Amino acid sequence: YLCEAFLPDEAKDCIQQVIGALPFSAVELYHDNNDIHALQPNDVTRRHLHITHSPTVFVDSMTEVPSPISKALFSTEPENQPALLDFLRAQPRYDRYEIVASSSSLVELTAKGANKGGMVRRLAELLGIRQENVACVGDHANDISMLNWAGMAFAPANALPQVLALPQVHRL
């Protein structure tokens, strides 16, 4: 990894609160050594883990999840995602985190500033590449910070409408 940002330990309480309030949601918890812990797995979780072939430890409580956590990936059926996002964004402590949908059924919770835009900027700085010479391609909400920062931004025709609506994005 170029760098890694971890969720503060208080995030465990926040994650447990989401799982308790929204029983249709599950969460995968990612660690810096690529370990994954899954809490309250649902069909979306199982499909995601099957696609990624990621070894996962299934747990019954956040107390079983070691720290540090680099990302919490909530999963729910697409029709429930708006309720999940609304719940997350309405919590008073959640302004301390990045909350973004990465697909129609997945929502990422990461440390504030831990997003694709920040990482592309940091990589460009380390490599001495000027912003106007950085090209990025993205199609979903978790790509918006990266596309906003890039000197040249592109998206496929089937990208989310809010991605295609970005003024600097060129449609592929």
Predicted segment positions?
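A short acidic, helix-capping loop that chelates divalent metal ions and anchors anionic groups
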Residues: 1, 106-108, 163-164
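Glycine/small-residue-rich loop that forms an oxyanion/phosphate-binding "nest" at active or ligand-binding sites
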Residues: 1-12
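Flexible, active-site-adjacent loop/turn segments at secondary-structure boundaries
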Residues: 5, 104-107, 170
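Generic low-polarity alpha-helical segments
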Residues: 7, 15, 46-47, 168-171
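Conserved acidic, metal-coordinating active-site core of Asp-based
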Residues: 14, 18-137, 158
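Acidic, Mg2+-coordinating phosphoryl-transfer loop and its flanking beta/alpha structural elements
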Residues: 120, 130-172
